[in-house]
Amino acid sequence: MNNLHLICNAHIDPVWLWEIEEGVAETLSTFRVAADFCDDYDGFIFCHNESMLYEWVEKNDPVLFGRIVRLVKEGKWHIMSGWYLQPDCNIPCGESFVRQILAGRYYFLEKFGVEPHTAINFDAFGHSRGLVQIMKKAGYDSYIFCRPEPDMLDLPSDTFNWVGFDGSKIACCRAYNSYESHRGEADEKIKGWMELHRGKKVGMVLWGIGDHGGGPSRIDLKKIEELKNSEKEFNLIHSTPEAFFEELAESGEKLPDYSGIMNPRYTGCYTTMMRTKQIHRKLENELYMTEKMSAHALMANVSDYPSEAIEKATKDLMLVEFHDILPGSAIEPVGEYAQEVAGHGLTELRPEKIKAFLALCSDKAKAEDGTIPVFVYNPHPYEVDETVEVEFQLPDQNKNPALYSVPHVYSGGVEIPCQREHEVSNFNVDWRIKTVFFAKLPAGTMSRFDIKMVLCENPQPPVQPEGDEFVWNNGKTKVIVNLKTGLIDEYEADGKVGLGKDSL
């Protein structure tokens, strides 16, 4: 008989149509029920992923956590995938995917002594091709996903080799008819797969109540057992993702190659909730900048490394990358929660970034009188051509309205092009200065630039007030602005009045 691997899971969205507190409670409830089923039913295997959820259990119910450790050792509970959570698989940068994998892998290896080699992202809305080489180099040889579905993306087969940009390959399976089954309907889902795949040597079906947790039910296990006893072509076995792919490889089935991305699905999610996407990218950039500067300062023996702050900020980043938070497909309170989580990460990083930055500046020469030193750090392992914006305070206010301060920027004693722009402040005194200059920043280096100020004659604007009005007239267009109200009193073009007094 041909084997059909039944993989029982309980997809738990930490947040979605509910908030994080409910996600924690549902995780505990689902894991308790699943542990009972593992003890009560011989041959049954429960599969679950996401180390963040296991951390919740470890913190809030140590006894249950101990049961799960025992069940994993007994082969009744399978640690699946081994990521921190199921993130959005399009928006994060490559390094963020690496962190999702490493955080989960380290946790499961430490707590359970396991290293899964099949990755899963059941509920993500698409998958970047760049994931292939990341997963391959992280120790994965296979991948299970559900979206995009067959009506959204035509693949050469539902089991295939996904080829990455660097030529890496991993075996993939697009799961049949989603990752879950409704209560009492798992057998119907299994029958549906068998009807479509008569003659197939090896197959896989995901089942279990999901989204808001749930997992197995007694009625489903009863019906599956009845189906198992009556089915003549397929041997139904409770199994794991790794067991399925191992048998698939041994079956001799030649898998076709696919070298594309796996998109699109729910494309509107990638054009909405911009606040979440913006603060995610800000946290992402601040985390990796702070981490690199801190590591540099440690190696230079000028500062220690802020491991605790980096770990906290990394977990905040990974949570914001959850596949219903970052795309913006959750309820409004979840969007507000994302701002809180990302804000916490930024708050953790800020003092550490300041500390590392100042430490890396500590060996720089003292500035000469009248010179304002500016330091710019390039965290990248390559030279960067960058437009640098900087604000600084003059030692004293320029109170002469006939003069204004002009910055001159020098790099290694050579003057480089720059320009003064309006500072963020609207404080109407020549005291706070913003300048912009173009710079070449060497890789992994703290670069120094020196600014010297020159007082220049303040040019007079060509148009002067006429009483209580500003009047611009070039012969074709005439505009009159009321100095008392700031409004346009008159607008005329080619002799035609567009706006008259009191129009606004």
For each feature predicted by the language model, list its residue ranges.
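Catalytic-domain carbohydrate-binding cleft regions of carbohydrate-active enzymes
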Residues: 1-373, 412-416, 435-447, 491, ...
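Catalytic cores of glycan-processing enzymes that make or break glycosidic bonds
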Residues: 6-8, 18, 318, 398, ...
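A conserved amphipathic helix/loop scaffold
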Residues: 214-219, 235-238, 420-429, 459-465, ...
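Surface beta-strand/loop "capping" patches
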Residues: 351-388, 460-474
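Beta-strand-rich interaction surfaces with strong enrichment in secreted/lumenal proteins
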Residues: 377, 424-426, 436-440
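Surface-exposed beta-strand/loop patches in extracellular or lumenal glycoproteins
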Residues: 380-407
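Beta-strand-rich N-terminal accessory domains
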Residues: 383, 452-504
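Solvent-exposed beta-strand/loop surfaces of large extracellular or lumenal domains
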Residues: 401-434
